[in-house]
A protein has these predicted regions:
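Surface-exposed assembly/interface segments
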Residues: 1-190
């Protein structure tokens, strides 16, 4: 298990746990006074998904998103400078616009990996007039779903606690769950 203490900041927690639902939950607990948290990251069997991309603007460029998202994100890519590859400027947000990245230049390859998210953006520019591919104010938006644990994933993590020698107060399972999972957890503890 990874140990997170109450004196760790957001940056240190994210270094340990990444941009994950577990990190989000741990930060909430630390913010509310938890002094020590033992974390058992679980590789979810069901991978995260990416929604359809919606475009705002009338330029000729396009964007797709690929990868295995590691959390639920509300992504907004907004163009702040006109052009094509290696000239257009953009910002991105992974929290629905609450915060934005610094402005960056659209890479020469047309591909940009959003750091720490597991998502890669692939842009296509207009072949005949690349300088008209993206206009100021163009935006591409989409959401992702976090990876999902199966009942077996949760039960395997709980099984590891039986060999854990530290004293702890409770178990917090992070992520979506179903009544069937809780029935399986209850049965495993009997």
């Amino acid at each position: 298990p990874l140990t997170i203490t109450g004196n760790m900041g957001v940056t240190k927690i994210r270094e340990s746990l990444g941009l994950s639902p577990l990190a989000d939950s741990v930060m909430d607990s630390v913010e509310n006074g938890a002094s020590r948290i033992y974390c058992i990251p679980v590789k979810a069997t069901t991978e995260g998904t990416i929604s359809e991309i919606k475009k705002t603007g009338d330029s000729s460029g396009s964007c797709t998103a690929e990868g295995k998202p590691n959390n639920a994100y509300s992504v907004i890519v907004e163009f702040t400078g006109k052009g094509g590859f290696n000239t257009a400027l953009f910002t991105y947000s992974i929290d629905g616009g609450f915060s934005k990245s610094d402005e960056g230049t659209l890479p020469m390859t047309g591909e940009f990996e959003i750091p720490g998210t597991g998502v890669t953006l692939k842009f296509t520019q207009d072949a005949s007039t690349p300088e008209e591919s993206f206009h100021i104010g163009d935006a591409f938006t989409f959401t992702t779903m976090a990876p999902q644990m199966t009942n077996a994933d949760a039960l395997n993590a709980i099984g590891k606690l039986k060999q854990f020698d530290e004293l702890f107060e409770f178990v917090h399972i992070v992520g979506e769950s179903t009544p069937a999972m809780w029935a399986a957890v209850s049965e495993a503890q009997a």
